[in-house]
Amino acid sequence: MDKKEAVINTARDLFQKYGYKKVSMDEIAKTSGVTKKTIYTYFKDKDSMFLYFIEEELQKMKRKIEKKNNSDLPFIEVVATNLYDMLIFRKNSMLISTISKEIKNGNDKCCDFLKVYDDEILSYIEEKINLEIKKGNIKKCDAHLT
């Protein structure tokens, strides 16, 4: 395992176990066996590291959804299944669970992280709706409102 991978795995584990606020860059460095300077060659700060994990979660979810989009199911069934899968994915995500706990404990920074996650999901759904409008599978509408 290379240093970056060690840092990423350690940080992910620590964030999931203790939450965003309680984990320090010092702790990540110590636990992963690298210096803080090494961590800062990979990530600008703790926020950018946490956003990396949010993006990682989003990519996992998108890959799962894309598999269904490429199936022979009717469009409406694909949409319903995708929305359900997104909700289940979010419910079962350790990262989102960690963010939710932080928000309950008054960490406003985590509200921003959750907004990034939610905005990305909404943008993704809107993109898929616009694609289906172009294909003629659904009537023209405001995809953002839909």
Where do the model's predicted regions map?
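Short coil/turn segments at alpha/beta junctions that flank glycine-rich nucleotide-binding fingerprints
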Residues: K17-K21, S93, K135
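Helix-turn-helix
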Residues: A6, T10, L14-S48, Y52
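Hydrophobic alpha-helical connector segments
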Residues: Y52, E56, E66-K91, T146
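Amphipathic alpha-helical segments used for helix-helix packing
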Residues: I88-K109
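Solvent-exposed, non-membrane alpha-helical residues enriched in polar/charged side chains
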Residues: K4, R12, Q16, Y40, ...
